[in-house]
From Swiss-Prot:
Sequence ranges assigned to domain KilA-N in this UniProt record: 15-119
Protein's name in the database: Putative KilA-N domain-containing protein 315L
Transmembrane annotation, as ranges: none
Pfam families given in the database record: KilA-N, MUG113
Organism: Invertebrate iridescent virus 6
SMART domains cross-referenced by the UniProt entry: T5orf172 (SM00974)
Top-level division of the source organism's lineage: Viruses
Length: 232
């Protein structure tokens, strides 16, 4: 194969084509001879941004950058347009194909996989108090929290959930990063932006949530509030 252009068999729009390479259906930009890495990862049930956060991936990108190889680039567009949706994403030179292919073929779940969650209540969030923990089943964990507190108001809700291959390790790492803000146990008094910053360089992926701030309730004294909610 001289280039990715040789594998193209169907035009999507403009310079974008479908191609078949080693049993993988790719979206190819004929102008650059690069493939859509985002779509390739999606086809394997994973997200490209997770791959970019791996240490091995960072070293690989640095290696090709030092060699002066073609760099990755992003194509954006209105995803309401079906044809545009098929072409948006990050494009990468063929040099990256094998590594990304091996990664998406790894088992998605392991005994250590799960999520690290950040939850709060409308009362706690007024004082920037958040609970950070890990679980394999967030819905069940949240239900357990709120069933235990069935007579108390308000209920816990999620402000951030991170998918990861090693949930316990990630939780421990985040707790260490935020140790100066620890209030009690898994509770931290710190701005949400600081918590999210702590996750940025870790091997995890933020899940999409519908979250709106609610400051309708407050307590004057934080310690009284925590005692009232049986936190301390």
């Amino acid at each position: 194969m001289a280039s990715l252009n040789d594998i193209c068999y169907e035009k999507i729009k403009d310079n974008f084509y479908y191609g078949l390479f080693r049993d993988f259906k790719l979206v190819v930009d004929k102008n650059t001879e690069c493939f859509n890495a985002t779509k390739l990862c999606n086809s394997g049930g994973k997200q490209f941004r997770q791959w970019t956060r791996l240490e091995k991936s960072k070293k690989l990108m640095e290696y090709y950058s030092r060699r002066g190889s073609q760099q990755m680039y992003e194509i954006k567009g209105d995803n309401k347009d079906q044809l545009v949706t098929q072409t948006t994403g990050t494009y990468a030179p063929i040099d990256f194909f094998e590594d990304i292919k091996r990664w998406i073929q790894l088992p998605k779940a392991s005994s250590a996989s799960g999520v690290v969650y950040v939850v709060t209540t409308s009362i706690l969030q007024v004082h920037n108090v958040f609970k950070i923990g890990y679980t394999k089943n967030f819905e069940e964990r949240l239900k357990t929290f709120n069933d235990y507190r069935h007579s108390l108001e308000p209920q816990f809700f999620a402000v951030a959930i991170y998918d990861t291959d090693n949930a316990k390790k990630l939780e421990t790492t985040i707790h260490k990063k935020l140790k100066d803000f620890r209030s009690e146990g898994e509770f931290f008094q710190v701005e949400l932006s600081v918590i999210k910053e702590a996750f940025l360089k870790e091997d995890c992926c933020l899940k999409d949530l519908d979250y709106e701030e609610d400051h309708s309730n407050s307590f004057t004294d934080l310690n009284d509030k925590l005692k009232t909610l049986n936190i301390i």
